[in-house]
Every structure is written in structure tokens, then in C-alpha cells.
Amino acid sequence: MFEEIESKWTEDSGDYDDMIQKQLSDKRTVSYWTKELKKLLGPEPLRILEVGCGPGFMSIIAARLGHEVKAVDGSSGMVEKARRNMQHYHQTVEICQED
């Protein structure tokens, strides 16, 4: 069962990544989520575990705010996209595939 789910999310990872790229290139979207995470997380650096990170949008925002982020996803495709995005956006986030 897990293999079927992982396969589906990996198959869709390109579409999700396209959506993330559009969001990250939209200053209003990035500004909105940056403000929301600041309110939610507070000013002190935290250790954050994002489960179901997909291509890594929230992990990128949290890392930009100075938090230590570990991002986990069950899909090898999503993990691959998240790793590429962390490198592209110059963020240090530990990313791993877990179910």
C-alpha cells in the first residue's frame, strides 16, 4: 500500500514543484507566509520538524527565518525536489525520505 502512495506522490512531484516555484517567485505570497510563520513561531530560533514537506516551501521560509529545519516526506520525488530547492534557494535544511 505504501509503495502505491509513494509512487503517486512521486509522479505528482513535478506539478507540486511547479506550484512551489510560482509561490516562491511571488513576493506577496512569500511575504504573507513569512509574516504568518513569524507570528506562529516567535523570535527565538527553533528546531522544526516538517512532516510531509513536499518540495519544501514552508521549510525554505522557516530556514530563512533562522530556524533549524528537518524536512521529511514519504515520496522520493518530493524529497528530490526539496533537496534541489534548498540548494537553489541557498538554505540548509536536513531532508530525508521516511514513511
Predicted regions and their residues:
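Conserved class I S-adenosyl-L-methionine
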Residues: M1-P43
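Class I SAM-dependent methyltransferase SAM/SAH-binding core
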Residues: L49, P55-D99
